[in-house]
């Protein structure tokens, strides 16, 4: 079995790659995916987003090693094990990132990935239902829209931000990210619109694209060139041959794992496990970054939250409305209002992100408050803490060793303390007067730095945005894994294209920049001229040096 291009992983970037590489009928493409079908209400119904993430059928279910700065808790680290990868189990939140994020990438050695370079790819990939204005695309395969925004708590949140003196934004994915506004989601006609929906399924209708369900064991490297992938299916081990290139799009955990199993990585680590070293790249598995968040929860004194819909009977009603009519609560992820704020004067770009939810409940659907309530997921998104992904064993089926090293930088504590106090200021605005009851979490007794730190150690968790473990950079950077054209340094015919190549975490959710990475990598692979650079100038708060709002 062989093809011109073999793509490992059908997630956000892998699906985009499959679609773009196969547009030319002369190119044959094989996509390798271990996970099964995405058909079914648990994935397709937007409001059911908590279910697939908690199901072994759809999620690799990784756990970090004990995190020393978080009471030695092991933090859940889900990754999609299904057609569409993590885009099939995520929260469907659509955030491109800030212009400064991508300019930073270029400064770190990813030449050609500045904001002016990547904006045309964001436009190419999206079908924005907010219209085209020079910043947004309307002809792409990825549907992007706002939710219904019917709950009054969404409007109270945005109004509270205005009352607190913060900026408002009509389109945080357009010229102005900073401020309070309404959140966008990747849904369409009442369904999740994953990378599989947008890219992979249309590509699979072409005769030159094949999807193989299998377990990828390692990349076959002969004489310094990737020639195929060793896979396991039906109890048999075989090799799928690549006539041109192998592209790894297996996630920020599994992409470095595959490289190391194939002999590409830190030589000492590989030798310790008895793996033949093909290329010594010490950066493989290093530079792990993520977003952390906590839930700030408040009781609602009015029965307007989603709490009424939590009993099984009413969940069934909502499910039936969605199943038969594609209407009701089921058509939205319920993250319909948001904010992107700067933590202090002198901070040029937003670094605090809010997802507002009109119910008090954990992201995984557990530990719901036994009353009407509302919450925000609060995250400081530009942490300086760095972790790693290493091999547990030379056995391809052994889970990787994930060490996030969360909160290892002192600045993270300072920023998250500020997040707690800032959120109290926002929830204390007049817009919430008619809804605001007692604080559930952190709780009104949590006031001092020490009390806030104790709360954070017990309640901070991942926002599920890992990246950076196969860092893109210049060839003379010893910690870079791929060059700016996504080629693995030191191996011919091998690329990595997913969130693992991000030199620095972007500000916001990672599905959008991961898909963009697949789009742009496809042009590099095909030898196409990159899309023309944009001349749009993003909005930067003119008061950024002297004010946080």
From Swiss-Prot:
Pathway this chain belongs to: Amine and polyamine biosynthesis; betaine biosynthesis via choline pathway; betaine aldehyde from choline (cytochrome c reductase route): step 1/1
EC number(s) given by UniProt: 1.1.99.1, 1.2.1.8
Gene Ontology BP annotations: glycine betaine biosynthetic process from choline
Keyword annotations from UniProtKB, A to Z: FAD, Flavoprotein, NAD, Oxidoreductase
Signal sequence bounds: none
Biological role: Involved in the biosynthesis of the osmoprotectant glycine betaine. Catalyzes the oxidation of choline to betaine aldehyde and betaine aldehyde to glycine betaine at the same rate.
Family to which the UniProt record says this protein belongs: Belongs to the GMC oxidoreductase family.
Name under which the protein is recorded: Oxygen-dependent choline dehydrogenase
Gene field: betA
């Amino acid at each position: 079995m062989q093809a011109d291009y073999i793509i490992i992983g059908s997630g956000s970037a892998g699906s985009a790659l499959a679609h773009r590489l196969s547009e030319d009928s002369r190119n044959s493409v094989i996509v390798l995916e271990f996970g099964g079908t995405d058909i079914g209400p648990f994935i397709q119904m937007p409001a059911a987003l908590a279910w697939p993430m908690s199901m072994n059928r759809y999620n690799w279910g990784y756990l970090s090693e004990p995190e020393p700065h978080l009471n030695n808790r092991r933090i859940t680290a889900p990754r999609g094990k299904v057609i569409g990868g993590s885009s099939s189990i995520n929260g469907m939140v659509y955030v491109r990132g800030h212009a400064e994020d991508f300019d930073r990438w270029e400064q770190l050695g990813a030449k050609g990935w500045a904001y002016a370079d990547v904006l045309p790819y964001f436009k190419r990939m999206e079908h924005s239902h907010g219209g085209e204005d020079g910043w947004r695309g309307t002809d792409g395969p990825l549907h992007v829209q706002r939710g219904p925004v019917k709950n009054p708590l969404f409007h109270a949140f945005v109004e509270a931000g205005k009352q607190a003196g913060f900026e408002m934004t009509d389109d945080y994915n357009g010229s102005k990210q900073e401020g309070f506004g309404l959140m966008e989601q990747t849904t369409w006609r009442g369904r999740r619109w994953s990378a599989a929906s947008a890219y992979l399924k249309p590509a699979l209708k072409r005769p030159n694209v094949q999807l193989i369900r299998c377990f990828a064991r390692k990349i076959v490297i002969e004489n310094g060139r990737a020639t195929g992938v060793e896979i396991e299916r039906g109890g048999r081990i075989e090799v799928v041959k690549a006539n041109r290139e192998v592209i790894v799009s297996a996630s920020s955990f599994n992409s470095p794992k595959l490289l190391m199993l194939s002999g590409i990585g830190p030589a000492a680590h590989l030798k310790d496990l008895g793996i033949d070293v093909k290329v010594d790249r010490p950066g493989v598995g290093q530079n792990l970054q993520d977003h952390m968040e906590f839930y700030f929860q408040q009781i609602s004194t009015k029965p307007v939250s989603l709490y009424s819909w939590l009993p099984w009977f009413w969940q069934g009603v909502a499910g039936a409305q969605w199943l038969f009519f594609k209407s009701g609560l089921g058509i939205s992820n319920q993250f319909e209002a948001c904010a992107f704020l700067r933590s202090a004067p002198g901070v040029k770009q937003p670094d605090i992100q809010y997802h507002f939810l009109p119910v008090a409940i954990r992201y995984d659907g557990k530990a719901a408050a036994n009353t009407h309530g509302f919450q925000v997921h609060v995250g400081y998104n530009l942490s300086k803490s760095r972790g790693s992904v290493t091999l547990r064993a030379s056995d391809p089926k052994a889970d990787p060793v994930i060490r996030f090293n969360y909160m290892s930088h002192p600045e993270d504590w300072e920023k998250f303390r500020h997040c707690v106090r800032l959120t109290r200021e926002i929830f204390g605005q007049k817009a919430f007067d008619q809804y605001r009851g007692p604080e559930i979490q952190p709780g009104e007794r949590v006031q001092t730095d020490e009390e806030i730190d104790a709360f954070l150690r017990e309640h901070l968790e991942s926002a599920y945005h890992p990246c950076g473990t196969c860092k893109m950079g210049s060839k003379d950077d010893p910690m870079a894994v791929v060059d700016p054209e996504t080629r693995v340094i030191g191996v011919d015919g091998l690329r990595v294209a997913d969130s693992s190549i991000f030199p620095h975490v972007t500000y916001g959710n990672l599905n959008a920049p991961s898909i963009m990475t697949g789009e742009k990598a496809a042009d590099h692979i095909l030898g196409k001229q990159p899309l023309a650079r944009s001349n749009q100038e993003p909005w930067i708060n003119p008061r950024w040096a002297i004010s946080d709002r």
